[in-house]
Amino acid sequence: DPRVRKQYIQEQGAPIVIKADGLAAGKGVTVAMTLEEAYKAVDSMLVQGDFGSAGCRVIVEEFLEGEEASFFALVDGENAIPLESAQDHKRVGDGDTGPNTGGMGAYSPAPVLTKELQSIVMDSIIIPTVKGMSAEGSKFVGVLYAGLMIEKKSGMPKLIEYNVRFGDPECQVLMVRLESDLVQVLLAACRGELNGVSLKWSPGSAMVVVMASKGYPGSYQKGTVIENLEEAEAVAPGIKIFHAGTAFDSEGRFIATGGRVLGVTAKGNDLEEACDRAYLAVENVNWPGGFLPSGYWLESSTSETSMLERE
């Protein structure tokens, strides 16, 4: 009942977080800074049905101030091994503003997830979850994705949600850094043989910038032509363009078929170099029907925020 939800929201006050309880392609969360925003989010889910069956139930959560980070582990039912850290940015606008999306960019490693915090996450969140599921007779095998908030007040990680998949676009930056054979590691997970397995990662950093169809995450035009992708990949070392929503038209040209269309990914000796290379590649993609934020937020290890401006 929307009225019950709104009454509870009024009692709790803003800021507050409103979530669709089902799968909503990464767009089912509203961080409402005012009561009006929260009420509007409830109506969009429960009255207007914007998320279909995914929004038939609504979760109201406490607002936590801090930095979000993504933590991934491979699980074989009893054992879990961590992947490298990553951090994505979901808002569509310049300077990490605007509505949430499935993710407009990511980088790895995430400075906010120090080695000490990663150990805490494994010991206090991942391993207890894996052991608990096994004890209940529901062993989990696969990729466990913990959405975390590194709380500003305490500096400690809090679990916001679980997914059982790789993140998009976090997967892109992880895969270009992974030097181990992913197939063999996944097979080891399937066979219950992860105990003692370790992963090898390339040094340095990786960054992905998502190019989306104009209008996303709202309505957008499909079928716009994308050109110069091979040339864009060749402008600097370590660049890989991942396709998410593309197809060939009758003339053999790439066209956009979705909202988030390209993941322009680059490796570098550090985060700044990876960022420079990714944006250099983006500038060489010829796609009038696409867009991306003109600036990208990078969080330092001291949580101070800087912005690399792009023309």
From Swiss-Prot:
EC category name: ligase
Sequence ranges assigned to domain ATP-grasp in this UniProt record: 1-191
Pathway it works in: Purine metabolism; IMP biosynthesis via de novo pathway; N(1)-(5-phospho-D-ribosyl)glycinamide from 5-phospho-alpha-D-ribose 1-diphosphate: step 2/2
Broad class of where this protein is predominantly found: plastid
Enzyme Commission number: 6.3.4.13
Reactions this protein catalyses: 5-phospho-beta-D-ribosylamine + glycine + ATP = N(1)-(5-phospho-beta-D-ribosyl)glycinamide + ADP + phosphate + H(+)
PROSITE patterns, per database record: ATP_GRASP, GARS
This protein's UniProt keywords: ATP-binding, Chloroplast, Ligase, Nucleotide-binding, Plastid, Purine biosynthesis
Subcellular location: Plastid, Chloroplast
InterPro entries: ATP-grasp, ATP_grasp_subdomain_1, PRibGlycinamid_synth_ATP-grasp, PRibGlycinamide_synth, PRibGlycinamide_synth_C-dom, PRibGlycinamide_synth_C_sf, PRibGlycinamide_synth_CS, Rudment_hybrid_motif
Gene Ontology molecular function terms on file: ATP binding; metal ion binding; phosphoribosylamine-glycine ligase activity
Coiled coil: none
Classification via Pfam families: GARS_A (PF01071), GARS_C (PF02843)
GO annotation, biological process: 'de novo' IMP biosynthetic process; purine nucleobase biosynthetic process
GO terms under cellular component: chloroplast
Family: Belongs to the GARS family.
Protein name: Phosphoribosylamine--glycine ligase
